[in-house]
């Protein structure tokens, strides 16, 4: 599982995106299955780790210069950060689209921050997976699916003089 998180966090952000999306989706679905089995485990470290890693609540995804949302149901990066400015690459003055979705108990997200916290608590208190700048993003891994979208907000670029 650690290698999957490492590969996910360290993929390039620019370009055409991730490869092998179906395979990656299968991995994340398996991770959710495994973590759900931990929820009722008598092993306290497993049951508590599940609480850290499975994410429910509002999440947002920012697309730059997006005309239309492609609901492809693939797992992608979302954020639980309150301030979008915490996304190191985000420029609020450029044109962008903000998708807001709801991760639920039936359809949870996977919290990268929660994974890091669980590893720190139960395995290695010095564990790091990403840089402080990326850590502020509070990444949640969640599928891009129309049924989970609460709102779509399109922002035009600000004209600078």
Give residue spans per PLM region.
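Conserved NAD+-utilizing ADP-ribose enzyme module
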Residues: 1-57, 66-161
């Amino acid at each position: 599982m650690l290698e999957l998180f490492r590969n996910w966090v360290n993929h390039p952000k620019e370009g055409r995106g991730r490869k092998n999306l179906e395979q990656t989706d299968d991995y994340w679905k398996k991770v959710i299955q495994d973590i759900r089995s931990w929820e009722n485990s008598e092993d306290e470290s497993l049951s508590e780790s599940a609480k850290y890693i499975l994410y429910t609540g509002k999440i947002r995804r920012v697309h730059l210069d997006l005309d239309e949302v492609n609901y492809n149901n693939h797992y992608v990066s979302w954020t639980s950060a309150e301030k979008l400015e915490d996304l190191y690459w985000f420029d609020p003055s450029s044109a962008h689209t903000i998708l807001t979705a709801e991760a639920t108990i039936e359809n949870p997200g996977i919290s990268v921050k929660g994974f890091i916290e669980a590893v720190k608590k139960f395995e290695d208190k010095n564990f790091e997976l990403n840089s402080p700048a990326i850590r502020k993003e509070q990444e949640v891994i969640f599928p891009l699916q129309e049924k989970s979208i609460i709102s779509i907000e399109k922002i035009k670029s600000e004209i600078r003089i």
